[in-house]
């Protein structure tokens, strides 16, 4: 049975392995810069756990994916260039989503779970992250424009999906 739950400290080794696999996958697929060699940092992961926004996806008790999710907004989403968000309603944000090597469907499962939590999701990704862009398109996300990361760390393509009422 597949389920999503909050991250626990004992999940860290599995998460680190998943993040390492994700970094290698990105490099192999023409996206060496988005996560580099050390992203996400341990400090980021610890903060996500402390703020209860770090989650893991388990399949038959094995961790197959991890992500950060919050409905507290995202400061870098206040300004968007070359487009506009679909609405100004409260939204959830997904960050640092990664699936274990060889896992199929886990990222879609996680994204769908997030949508079930609030019905309005915003997410951003690197221009070179074609696999993620493909997943977002497959799941029905709309490209909204470009956002700028904090501290001049670059730009990201911004997407949104909402439950139609």
Where are the regions a protein language model picked out?
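A short beta-loop-alpha structural element at the N-terminal edge
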Residues: 3-17
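Conserved active-site alpha-helix within GNAT-family acetyltransferase domains
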Residues: 128-145
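Conserved acyl-donor/pantetheine-binding loop and adjacent beta-alpha core of acyl/acetyltransferases
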Residues: 68-102
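Conserved GNAT-fold acetyl-CoA-binding loop/helix
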Residues: 23-43
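Conserved acetyl-CoA-binding loop-helix of GNAT-fold acetyltransferases
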Residues: 99-116, 133-138
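Conserved beta-hairpin
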Residues: 52-69
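Conserved catalytic-core motifs of GNAT/GCN5-like acyltransferases
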Residues: 124, 142-156
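Conserved GNAT acetyl-CoA-binding A-motif
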Residues: 117-128
């Amino acid at each position: 049975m597949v389920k999503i739950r909050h991250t626990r400290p004992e999940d860290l080794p599995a998460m680190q392995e998943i993040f390492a696999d994700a970094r290698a996958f990105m490099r192999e697929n023409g996206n060496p810069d988005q996560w580099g060699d050390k992203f996400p940092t341990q400090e980021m992961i610890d903060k996500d756990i402390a703020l209860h926004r770090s989650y893991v996806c388990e399949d038959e008790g094995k961790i197959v994916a991890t992500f950060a999710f919050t409905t507290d907004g995202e400061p870098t989403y206040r300004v968007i260039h070359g487009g506009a968000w679909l609405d100004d309603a409260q939204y959830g944000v997904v960050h640092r989503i990664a699936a274990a090597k060889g896992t199929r469907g886990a990222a879609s499962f996680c994204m769908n779970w997030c949508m079930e939590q609030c019905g309005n999701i915003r997410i951003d990704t690197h221009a070179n992250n074609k696999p993620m862009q493909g997943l977002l398109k497959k799941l029905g996300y709309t490209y909204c424009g470009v956002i700028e990361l904090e501290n001049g760390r670059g730009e990201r393509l911004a997407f949104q999906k909402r439950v139609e009422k």
